[in-house]
Structure formats: C-alpha cells, structure tokens
Design a protein with these regions (language model features):
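Ubiquitin-like/PB1-type beta-grasp interaction modules and other compact soluble beta-rich domains
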Residues: 1-83
C-alpha cells in the first residue's frame, strides 16, 4: 500500500526526498512506520522520537493502522517564543 509522507521544519531540510509517497505493507501502524524510518536512518532518531504524527490532518496514536492513500505528517517539536 502507499501513503503520502509530509515532512515539516528541520525534517524537510534534512531529507527532502522523504517527503513523497511511500510503500508500506498492509496493516502497518504509525509506530511501524516510525520504526522503519529510524532503521533506515532517514530522519534523526532523537528528533523523530520527540515528534508528533498526524494522519489525514488529525493527531494519531502509535497504534493507528494506516490505509492506502493516508497522508502521514511528521511534526517536529515546536519551540521558541518568550517566557
């Protein structure tokens, strides 16, 4: 099955080619996709572990099962502003 990966912030700068359609096995979960990205060293593990994931523009739990055509956004931690 194919899902659309969307990267933001530093992820887009580090791995612009990863912001594309991705082949996954049927029944893959958000956690499985993140594990795959860590194994492939596509994105920095420390930053990846601190990030949120949205599927079809809604925050997703690691157990969420992905389906054909889902849009998966990897959202890095946000910082900045004034105390």
């Amino acid at each position: 099955m194919r899902v659309r990966m969307r990267l933001f912030g530093p992820f887009k700068e580090i791995a612009p080619a990863a912001d594309a359609w991705r082949e996954l096995r049927e029944g893959e979960t958000v956690a499985g996709l993140l594990a795959l990205l860590r194994r492939e060293a596509v994105l920095p593990e420390k930053l990846l572990l601190a990030s949120a994931v949205a599927v079809n523009q809604e925050y997703a739990q690691p157990t969420r099962i992905l389906v054909e055509g889902d849009e998966v956004a990897i959202l890095p931690p946000v910082s900045g502003g004034r105390p």
